[in-house]
């Protein structure tokens, strides 16, 4: 801000201000109200938005410092008002998008989107489709979608539809675990992501989702009444007909089914319902 660089050195170290014009480094600066508190926090990430410096800490939540009035405001997961909750006090990464929205990545709580007008947060976590609540980095592509690296794969978040699309080692994402802040977008919209086994690169515009829904067929059936009558193990019977007639006492049976596609078959999810017995799809 104004040719001033803010530097966070980590554990037990102060936040520094470096002035480009006179080549001076400051270890202290005016703070109203919480100066002692600011001197002991472990800052993980810094972001500047307008007159504010945002500081994400490892265990003390989020701080906002006004560079003109020198006021310091704290946001934490223990705030009394629910809408002021951070998803976690362990802030791992901060990101500002093209509209200067502040996105807060945490370890254990997912993502928080800060509303500057209401001074509140919208939380996105595993319940909303995020693959994991431990966030290592957040970076937007040229279309405004956020690419979020977690401890269990990469996720693409569409802010307009508020939906997640996830990638892991089951559908082509080869990193076992990403590293903190190890995500970079180049000027040509190429992403580079670093992990504990290697790093990878990809172009979001070239990724195509597999939207094909394969047909599902019942392939085998085992009727337990046969086991009770014949005093022998019930055998699996291959199913080739569209309709099967059962006797009145053949009320207990097991079926096997399959989706006829080998494209990332482990990602297929199934729902089932027995008409006349179940009230809805499971």
What are the roles of these predicted feature ranges?
Residues 19-23, 66-70, 115-119, 158-162, ...:
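Short loop/turn segments that connect beta-strands within beta-propeller blades
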Residues 35-42, 79-92, 122, 126-139, ...:
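Residue-level "micro-hotspots" composed of small/polar
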Residues 1-5, 12-17, 44-53:
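Sequence-structural signature of mature extracellular/luminal beta-sheet repeat domains
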Residues 4-8, 52-56, 101-105, 145-148, ...:
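Conserved beta-propeller blade signature
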Residues 11-15, 58-62, 107-111, 151-155, ...:
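Loop/turn residues immediately N-terminal
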């Amino acid at each position: 801000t104004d040719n001033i660089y803010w530097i966070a050195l980590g554990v037990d170290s102060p936040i520094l201000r470096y002035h480009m014009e006179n080549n001076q480094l400051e270890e202290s600066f005016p703070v109203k109200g919480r100066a002692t508190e600011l001197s002991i926090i472990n800052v993980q990430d810094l972001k500047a938005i307008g007159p504010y410096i945002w500081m994400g800490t490892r265990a003390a939540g989020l701080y906002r410092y006004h560079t003109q009035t020198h006021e310091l405001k704290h946001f934490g997961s223990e705030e009394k008002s629910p809408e002021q909750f951070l998803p976690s006090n362990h802030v791992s990464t901060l990101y500002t998008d093209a509209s200067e929205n502040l996105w807060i990545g945490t370890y254990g709580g997912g993502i928080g989107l800060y509303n500057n007008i209401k001074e509140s947060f919208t939380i996105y976590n595993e319940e909303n489709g995020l693959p994991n609540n431990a966030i290592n980095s957040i970076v937007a592509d040229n279309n405004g979608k956020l690419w979020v690296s977690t401890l269990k794969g990469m996720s693409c978040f569409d802010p307009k539809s508020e939906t997640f699309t996830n990638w892991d080692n089951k559908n082509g994402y080869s990193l076992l675990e990403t590293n903190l802040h190890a995500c970079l977008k180049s000027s040509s919209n190429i992403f580079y992501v670093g992990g504990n086994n290697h790093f990878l690169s990809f172009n979001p515009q070239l990724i195509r989702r597999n939207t094909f829904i394969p047909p599902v067929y019942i392939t085998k059936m085992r009727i337990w009444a046969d086991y009770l009558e014949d005093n022998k193990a019930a055998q699996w019977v291959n199913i080739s007909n569209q309709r099967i007639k059962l006797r009145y006492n053949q009320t207990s049976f097991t079926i096997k089914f399959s989706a006829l596609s080998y494209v990332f078959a482990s990602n297929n999810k199934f729902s089932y319902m027995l008409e006349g017995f179940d009230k809805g799809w499971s």
